[in-house]
Amino acid sequence: MERLTVTLGERSYPITIAAGLFNDPASFLPLKSGDQAMLVTNETLAPLYLDTVRSVLEQSGVNVDSVILPDGEQYKSLAVMDTVFTALLQKPHGRDTTLVALGGGVIGDLTGFAAASYQRGVRFIQVPTTLLSQVDSSVGGKTAVNHPLGKNMIGAFWQPVSVVVDLNCLKTLPKRELASGLAEVIKYGVILDGEFFSWLENNIDALLALDDTAMAYCIRRCCELKAEVVAADERETGLRALLNLGHTFGHAIEAEMGYGNWLHGEAVAAGMVMAARTSERLGQFRAQDTQRIIDLLKRAGLPVRGPQEMSAQAYLPHMMRDKKVLAGEMRLVLPLAIGSSELRGGVPHDVVLGAIADTQQAQQ
């Protein structure tokens, strides 16, 4: 069992990583006998895990209700979140309830925002079931829903009280979803840890094969890196923005193509290449390092170009609505070397457009 802590003073919380955690009542602390909980999951995951998690909580004396939402990024909306509020109010659940987010990034983000909003804030536990949510979205307290004009535009910073990562969930994960999660894994190596990037180059096949030892180390290292960043910059005023490498381009792809048509990790993968090409054009990143990123993304089964039907010009309106825009100026996370990155403002739009064109046209 791997265990680490996100250090935020009185709001610190544990991340527990192991196979079989869903069968251990202690995994879901601080829930205890007499507590009330609302399990939030989706229609795909409910047949796989809902009864197991409900049963282990009820064995501990927790009073459990549940709500099952439709599955897909297109349902990460205020309208669907209202379903959670209705379920909470119908029982009713008070301020002492705990929401349990049993699912991937959509369920985690939506449930977290519901927890931040319901009766001005209740506890919630993250139980991520996808690799992407296990290494990224479940840690750090960023919660949100989408708006037709932009991804994650309506939300709050609201930390969970615990993160429970059961490695067995990955055994039921579609290969495309596994690859999507590996995009966020690779991102950590590019922005923060060159040694980890090299480890990924040597172990990507083991991760694709769901080797328990390799996967446990991979998830722990990603969570360690994110926990360090969140502890230093919880509200994303500086350092934490580096975690958005590829996301400004990627969110543009998701919004333009319609949420759910490109998985988040797929869009981020293409966005990372575009960010690397931008940094190349600015003379601060080596072409051979861009190629290392491309090669690793391809081995993980990820796209290294954006949608062919999306013009370079189509990216800009979405990118100018990005949350990192400051005083009307686009700011991009750009790699400086494998394991080092910066948040840079004032990148000329023609450089960005050229980098997108480079990505789309290059022989990769």
Curated annotation (Swiss-Prot):
UniProt key word Nucleotide-binding: yes
Localization: Cytoplasm
Gene behind this protein: aroB
Essential cofactor(s): Co(2+); Zn(2+); NAD(+)
Disulfide bridge positions per record: none
InterPro entries: Dehydroquinate_synthase (IPR050071), DHQ_synth_AroB (IPR016037), DHQ_synth_fam (IPR030963), DHQS/DOIS_N (IPR030960), DHQS_C (IPR056179)
Source domain of life: Bacteria
Protein's job: Catalyzes the conversion of 3-deoxy-D-arabino-heptulosonate 7-phosphate (DAHP) to dehydroquinate (DHQ).
One example GO MF annotation: 3-dehydroquinate synthase activity
Cofactor note: Binds 1 divalent metal cation per subunit. Can use either Co(2+) or Zn(2+).
Name of the protein this chain belongs to: 3-dehydroquinate synthase
Family: Belongs to the sugar phosphate cyclases superfamily. Dehydroquinate synthase family.
Gene Ontology cellular component annotations, sorted alphabetically: cytoplasm
Record-listed E.C. numbers: 4.2.3.4
Pathway membership: Metabolic intermediate biosynthesis; chorismate biosynthesis; chorismate from D-erythrose 4-phosphate and phosphoenolpyruvate: step 2/7
Entry keyword Transmembrane: no
Species this chain originates from: Klebsiella pneumoniae subsp. pneumoniae (strain ATCC 700721 / MGH 78578)
Binding-site list for Zn(2+): 184, 247, 264
